[in-house]
């Protein structure tokens, strides 16, 4: 069973979130069984059935910027060292002990100093040192706001030259519509073609051309007297003139050669 001890600054919210995300992604791939976060000592203990060297290299590649150190251990926490026993005291040899003196010339031991009756030190009324405040958690950086869109440019007024001063009042100075372009002049009418000579020898009446069609019947009685069809009425009927009177008998006439010889 492999054990990794990763040293990371868990007080930093970004480092904490980064190492949790990386270990969460590698949990199934490397069979990580247990992950312990020691916030006080800034350590992360990873346990599981994995190759510690391969997992160590993978974590360095994924989160190398926030990791301070990675240790590969067999047992965690490490066993405490045995307490140090003081060396046994050597007994002084008996020969070194001073022997009591039985003579009267020995000096008497000095008297013990009397206890001091001075005033006891007054207790200190200073303020106790306050514990260090924890740094505020790092706030995630806000994504940069997109730059505000520029307003569309205002339409520029085109200045048109005009005579100065302008006569007053001058209606429609700016409201006049755009003048229409001049129309092209109309084409001149075509001259009718002259009639072509038919080339026939009839002097008075030409038979080369077909006769015009007869006028349509107007449906009137035929007299065209009070008809509104626009056709002139027929001329009135005229009786034949009376025969010429024979010449008087006294008139001289030439003999008719064809007459009978008896007459």
Curated annotation (Swiss-Prot):
GO terms for biological process: defense response to fungus; regulation of defense response to fungus. It comes from the Eukaryota. PROSITE patterns: HMA_2. A metal cation binds at residues 12, 15. Keywords: Metal-binding, Plant defense. One of its GO terms (molecular function) is metal ion binding. Residues 1-68 form the HMA domain. Residues 139-153 have a biased composition (Basic and acidic residues). Disruption phenotype: The pi21 allele confers an improved non-race-specific blast resistance toward Magnaporthe oryzae. Residues 126-153 are annotated as: Disordered. InterPro entries: HMA_dom, PI21. Involved in defense responses. Contributes to slowing defense responses toward Magnaporthe oryzae. This is Protein PYRICULARIA ORYZAE RESISTANCE 21. The gene is PI21.
